[in-house]
Swiss-Prot record:
Protein name: Ras-related protein RABB1a
Protein family according to the UniProt entry: Belongs to the small GTPase superfamily. Rab family.
An example Gene Ontology molecular-function term: GTPase activity
Region (Disordered): 179-205
Any one Gene Ontology BP term: protein transport
CC annotations in GO: plasma membrane
Function: Intracellular vesicle trafficking and protein transport.
InterPro entries the UniProt entry points to: P-loop_NTPase (IPR027417), Rab_GTPases_membrane_traffic (IPR050209), Small_GTP-bd (IPR005225), Small_GTPase (IPR001806)
Residues holding GTP: 13-20, 61-65, 119-122, 149-150
Gene: RABB1A
Database matches in Pfam families: Ras
Polar residues bias: start-end ranges: 194-205
Amino acid sequence: MSYAYRFKYIIIGDTGVGKSCLLLKFTDKRFQAVHDLTIGVEFGAKTITIDNKPIKLQIWDTAGQESFRSVTRSYYRGRAGTLLVYDITRRETFNHLASWLEEARQHASENMTTMLIGNKCDLEDKRTVSTEEGEQFAREHGLIFMEASAKTAHNVEEAFVETAATIYKRIQDGVVDEANEPGITPGPFGGKDASSSQQRRGCCG
């Protein structure tokens, strides 16, 4: 299937926060309560629609273990979007966010769009991180923020789509130069030049 743009994502965060579950729910609409730990990097893809244009998302799901961090670092380069995930029932995963974010910004493009996801919001009775704390962290660091549940699918699609919509808007607004961002690839009938030429043709009949 052809696309207007291809955006590359990376999912990061501590082990066990539900990164692989979020990806599986988004791409396959499936939830696995017991999921093998990611060894290195896993991959998923899905095409969504933004502004009536097909956008292909290629998503790399990374291992959270310290022993794989060097592998993860090499995948930051050439990513247009990052999903930074913590578990609302495990405060230590929230406390580690600053370290993950610093590493991402050190190795990735300065124009990378980052979505902060507080996962497992279906476990409200076990919550140890408040929604307000997540909102404050996102605000302080210039991130988008959502709480989600890979189990119930709450905000899973929305998180991936909102990240893409933000990247797309930044391209259209000229904040991000698609030609100089390896994580963004105009498709066969995509890109700003294509959309503007289509508009010109439309105006001329």
